[in-house]
Amino acid sequence: MARVTVEDCLEHVDNRFELVMLSTKRARQLATGGKEPRVAWENDKPTVVALREIAEGIVTNEFIAAEEIVTEDPVFAAFEDENNEAV
C-alpha cells in the first residue's frame, strides 16, 4: 500500500480546504454512489482511495462536477423545476 500525504495532494489542489471538500465528495461517490475507483483499491477505505486518486492527479473538481451532472436523477430534476416556478 502506497502512503499518500497531504503534500502529494496539494500539488493538484489549490489549498487544504478544497482538498477536504474534493476528497469528501469523491469518497462518498466511491462508498455510496457505485462509482469505480480509478486506482487499485488495495483493501483501502474509500477516503484513502479518494486521496490516492487526487494525489495522482486523476480526480479534480472538474472530474467531480462532470460525475455529478451525469448521475443527476432526471425525475428529481423535473420535480425541482416544478417547485421553483413563480406563483
UniProtKB/Swiss-Prot annotation:
**Enzyme's top EC category:** transferase
InterPro entries membership: DNA-dir_RNA_pol_omega, Pol_omega/Rpo6/RPB6, RPB6/omega-like_sf
Assigned EC number:
2.7.7.6
Please provide the record's keywords in A-Z order: DNA-directed RNA polymerase, Nucleotidyltransferase, Transcription, Transferase
| Pfam families attached to this UniProt entry | RNA_pol_Rpb6
Q: Which family does the record claim for this protein?
A: Belongs to the RNA polymerase subunit omega family.
Q: What the protein does?
A: Promotes RNA polymerase assembly. Latches the N- and C-terminal regions of the beta' subunit thereby facilitating its interaction with the beta and alpha subunits.
The annotated subunit structure for this chain is: The RNAP catalytic core consists of 2 alpha, 1 beta, 1 beta' and 1 omega subunit. When a sigma factor is associated with the core the holoenzyme is formed, which can initiate transcription.
User: Which PANTHER family does this UniProt record tie to the protein?
Assistant: DNA-DIRECTED RNA POLYMERASE SUBUNIT OMEGA (PTHR34476:SF1)
Q: Output this protein's name.
A: DNA-directed RNA polymerase subunit omega
Origin organism is Pseudomonas putida (strain ATCC 47054 / DSM 6125 / CFBP 8728 / NCIMB 11950 / KT2440)
Taxonomy of the source species: Bacteria, Pseudomonadati, Pseudomonadota, Gammaproteobacteria, Pseudomonadales
The gene it comes from is rpoZ
